[in-house]
Amino acid sequence: MISEATQALFCDVFGQPELFEGLNRVTRRVVAWPFGAGARVLAHSAVVVAEQTLLERLRSLPSGGGALEISEAGWTIVASRPLPRSSAEKHFGDRIARAIAVTLADGADRSACYVESLDDGWLFLLPDSATTGWLLAVGGESESLLDRSRLLGGQLAEVRSVGAEFRAYPRIAWPLCGPAWLACGTGALAFDPLCGDGSGNAVREAILAAAVVRAVARGGNPDELLAHYRTRLLAGFHRHLQVCRQYYLGGGSSAWWAEQLEWLHKGLAWCETELASAPAARYQLRGFDVQRIG
């Protein structure tokens, strides 16, 4: 699910105002949170698109013409695992998400997504067409969570298939960069799907990464520029943990929710320690370029 702000970012960066045309739109968010609370209906604005579909749309865009000149790379951009030997993953959680393909009930609202907390996890239903959708189940066994749902029973006709499991907790590569390399996208950060805007964050990281490499190529101080990159991404990760904390504080009062909060508190403490020793800001991003302040 891609928010309105992130849609605008994609369209601006790629110069394609119609990039998200024809996709299923979500205009309402139905929330039963914390555990035991009644449902609330909130205004929302997002589109639902599979990663592969978005990649295919981006790859079909005009390239601008002309042959590309290929030369030996001076930098390594780590966009996925494995990380360089000098870097390791810091993780703050252990919860697993299961992606479940579902058929929507005849009376289901295709323009709404549904979020519900239970005593040992949470559910997130996302329609992706007039008849189908995806259910994310995090925490307890997916069948048990769905059986106990007070919100989703009337929205589903059947479970079509249970897809892959994936890690649903915040993670960061540390350090994020070094001499002639930097991590970006999923190689750098991973967000909780409940609270994060992973695709938008990846675009912003890519803009900053390209700007830093370009600034170094123009004669900028590589140590200062890499420190700026590292600090900006770390600050963004810290903000994500703060948002997660607000959600998980209100999710429930069971041991499962307490454990998730403990992980988040560890992550916040680690981030704050690292940020306290970070150098003062010397650069800022202006458009697609990093410029020295002052």
Where are these regions (language model features)?
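N-terminal glycine-rich phosphate-binding loop and ensuing alpha1 helix
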Residues: M1-L9
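Predominantly flavin-linked oxidoreductase catalytic cores and closely associated redox partners
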Residues: R59-S161, E165-A173, L189
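C-terminal helical "tail/cap" subdomain of flavin- and related membrane-associated enzymes
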Residues: R214-G294
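FAD/FMN-dependent oxidoreductases across multiple families
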Residues: E141-A227
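A structure-centric signal for secondary-structure junctions around beta-strands
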Residues: V26, T132, G178-P179
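Tryptophan-centric aromatic hotspots in well-structured domains and transmembrane helices
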Residues: W33, V47, W75, W122-L123, ...
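Conserved N-terminal helical subregion
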Residues: A8-A101
